């Protein structure tokens, strides 16, 4: 028999215990296993679209530009085009190319309630310092500072690209994207070979690579120091 401690209730049949367990216990189920073929296709299609968006959207400005394209393809228009708003209007407003607000105008005023969905557009990255370029040992490097919660050791010896915008004195904007195309040069942060890294490997994981070490190689040449002198 099965008896509950501190209770007068006694369950003699184990099947009763299983029945109670099935009724009262939270059951963990794999949400993937009961999906149909059509549902799986929809899941993969959605994931592919999201991956493509992420591949094209690596900075706030790129995210906003791509979000604008998606919004306009779904009937949204800049609020600057409207003198008055009507029920059902779909509008957006872009703030300095780095944040975006979208709204669908409802039937009642905001005092009756409002539904808000928020998402952030920033992500962990390395930002170039104001005067980033320096030369050491025939190599040109970029000085950086990291943004967001990063595991610094994950950023070494992998191909990196540079994304951003340069504003010239006359106000002209030049958008920069180097390293994503297969024909582009890539940037990388060097690390020590295992047989040279005994001291480094004795450190704690978070200390093995410091923030000051996250300086990508931007150029290398036998006469790099002469080239830099002419920049």
List the model feature ranges, each with a label.
Residues 4-13, 220-227:
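Conserved small/polar residues in nucleotide/adenosyl-binding loops
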Residues 19-60:
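N-terminal capping segment at the start of a domain
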Residues 48-89, 94-96:
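TRNA-binding/sensing appendages of the translation machinery
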Residues 56-57, 150-151, 180-181, 213-222:
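Flexible, glycine/proline-enriched loop segments at strand-loop-helix junctions
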Residues 78, 82-128:
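Acidic/His- and Gly-rich active-site-bordering loop/insert found
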Residues 113-198:
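A generic, well-ordered mixed alpha/beta core segment in the N-terminal half of proteins
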Residues 188-191, 195-219:
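Residues forming anionic-ligand binding surfaces in small-molecule and nucleic-acid pockets
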């Amino acid at each position: 028999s099965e008896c509950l401690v501190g209770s007068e209730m006694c369950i003699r049949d184990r099947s009763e215990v299983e029945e109670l367990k099935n009724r009262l216990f939270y059951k963990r189920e794999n949400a993937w296993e009961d999906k149909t073929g059509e549902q799986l296709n929809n899941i993969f299609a959605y994931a592919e679209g999201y991956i493509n968006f992420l591949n094209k959207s690596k900075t706030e400005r790129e995210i906003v530009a791509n979000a604008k394209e998606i919004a306009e393809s779904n009937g949204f228009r800049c609020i600057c085009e409207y003198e008055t708003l009507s029920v059902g209007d779909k509008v957006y407003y872009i703030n300095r190319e780095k944040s975006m607000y979208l709204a669908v105008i409802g039937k009642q005023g905001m005092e009756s309630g409002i539904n808000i969905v928020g998402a952030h557009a920033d992500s962990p990255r390395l930002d170039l310092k104001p005067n980033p370029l320096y030369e050491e040992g025939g190599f040109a490097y970029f000085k950086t500072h990291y943004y967001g919660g990063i595991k610094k050791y994950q950023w070494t010896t992998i191909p990196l690209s540079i994304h951003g915008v340069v504003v010239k004195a006359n106000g002209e904007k030049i958008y920069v994207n180097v390293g994503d195309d297969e024909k582009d040069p890539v940037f990388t942060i060097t690390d020590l070979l295992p047989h040279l890294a005994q001291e480094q490997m004795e450190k704690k994981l978070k200390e093995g690579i410091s923030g000051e070490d996250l300086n990508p190689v931007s150029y290398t040449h036998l006469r790099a120091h002469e080239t830099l002198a002419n920049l």
